[in-house]
Amino acid sequence: MESPAFSKPLKDKTIKKALLGVLGILLVTGGLAHKDSPHLIYNLTWEVTNGEQETVWAVTGNHPLWTWWPDLTPDLCMLALHGPTHWGLDNRPPYSSPPGPPCCSGDKGAVSGCARDCDEPLTSYSPRCNTAWNRMKLAQVTHAPKEGFYVCPGSHRPRWARSCGGPEAYYCASWGCETTGRAAWKPTSSWDYITVSNNLSSPQAPKACKNNGWCNPLVVRFTGPGKRATSWTTGHEWGLRLYISGHDPGLTFGIRLRITDLGPRVPIGPNPVLSDQRPPSRPVPARPPPPSNSTPTGDPLTPPTGDPLTPTKPPQAGTGDRLLNLVQGAYLALNMTNPTKTQECWLCLVSEPPYYEGVAVLGDYTKHETAPTNCSSRAQHKLTLSEVTGQGKCLGAVPKTHQALCNHTEPTVSGSNYLVAPEGTLWACSTGLTPCLSTTVLNLTTDYCVLVELWPKVTYHPSEYVYTQFEPGVRFRREPVSLTLALLLGGLTMGGIAARVGTGTTALVATQQFQQLQAAMHNDLKAVEESITNLERSLTSLSEVVLQNRRGLDLLFLKEGGLCAALKEECCFYADHTGLVRDSMAKLRERLNQRQKLFESGQGWFEGLFNRSPWFTTLISTIMGPLIVLLLILLFGPCILNRLVQFVKDRISVVQALILTQQYHQLKSIDPEEVESRE
């Protein structure tokens, strides 16, 4: 700030500021709009920049987003690199070593190549960082009781602070703009994002200066509002000015967060959503035995045409291989644990979400102080489980609507640790699936998680049920209860059902069948998540944006190829003890033909007549009704007609009698004896 003609008393710099309302900063995404799990580990780099937006200091760590708030300790002179000319470092690039020559101690000749005596007084016209002597005097200023420095916010300041100016005034054009620093009046703020102070005590700084090093380190700490802000990826700026007599020199600096581990970007081009729809690969034929090492005389060995040292990347599995591997893995796991159910059955893939379901289990997780490798892997964080059964271990603030899934709820774990789920399990959180949890995220958010086993939504049907669905005239009174793979195998990794089927937990997890199912689920989940990502970034028609259509297209692709039989909304594969049958549609036709022949062989000639002549059945059912009605009329019609005629005659006679009665009067009868007696 420009100094007035008279001296600046301390009270001029302690003007009371107007009361400010606390700004509520919402937990929304600023510079980065991410939809991944909050527990996902990223490579985070906090950078301190100079006025030219060049990075002069940085610190890197692997942590979840918005959970790592380290102390930033750049040197004050580092902020002046490529800065204003009065700092003396305008021609030195970032990350330059401290310029010399060193500072003399008492006698100028005591240090070889020294420039000035360390005890000479500092003037306001001297550069601040270009020599060891200037850096030592700068340390004296920043630690002096009546001097120091103050910091003013730039880009994120409120509207009333427009009078604070811009970068040309280091955002400190008027008093009251300062929010932090190391000054006598102790500037503070309830809304600024950082606090700035010295990182070395007054006795420590001169020693570092005399050794020709950076000796004015600052310590920048994030405040509560700063930790709630999520706009650090775009960066924020501040201005810093020294509080000395005369003109207050200053500079500007910025702080930003760089996130370098966001995964690959999808270029604009052909939509890759449906590019992997390929038929299943044919089984590899058995290779012939290798020829003997002996070669005919004079016949030199032919060198191989290909380079055996060149690694070949295996092609990505298409729709056919991916879904068939998923059903094959389900069959192997079911056949190993319960062989009686795989004598003859149908395993069906559903076309409607959810495609996976979870079984809550109890297990012991492992706690790590540093992020393990699987915590930084981009697991299925876009996928959520809408169907979870059972009771298991829960973490976080579980709402009442989901407490039925918790057999044991652990309180919130303090500290900054990483909780890794046991092998074969995942954490099903309100934000998605993840193999690793961050206790910092659980403490800062309302996220909650349940330890679950993940099983594909594969429906088990007995063969009799499937055949009757394709046979005409056979209907169940009610729909049978569908058994899924989760109900048949749920809890195996934690030993829940394994003890009942006589299979140890360790043995099951280590078996090749279970590993094959886990690998198939991982590949399918990866494909589904990639489909979601591609659909989110797709620039084509909106008809591709429905995930259900994607899985429906996959199953339709298998159905049209004859690989599965369509049963309602499911795509079913036939399986028995010989294994999974790929040509399931042909197998279904074969089984239906066998059942039809067996049914016909047990029928009589009359029943067979109806089966062999479908038109006869239609004709009889059409004319049978009218014939029966006509026969009834011929049998009972005359009798009914006679009774009706007799009834009509009787009624007519009664009417005639009534009419005659009304026309004539009845004469009174006279007894002759009574007449004679009167006379």
UniProtKB/Swiss-Prot annotation:
Query: What SUPFAM superfamilies does the annotation carry?
Result: ENV polyprotein, receptor-binding domain, Virus ectodomain
Q: Which domain of life is it from?
A: Eukaryota
- Its protein name is Retrovirus-related Env polyprotein from Fv-4 locus
Q: One Pfam family of this protein, by short name?
A: TLV_coat
Compositional bias of kind Pro residues? 280-293, 301-314
Stretches for region Disordered: 268-321
Which species?
Answer: Mus musculus (Mouse)
Q: InterPro entries, from UniProt?
A: FMuLV_rcpt-bd, TLV/ENV_coat_polyprotein
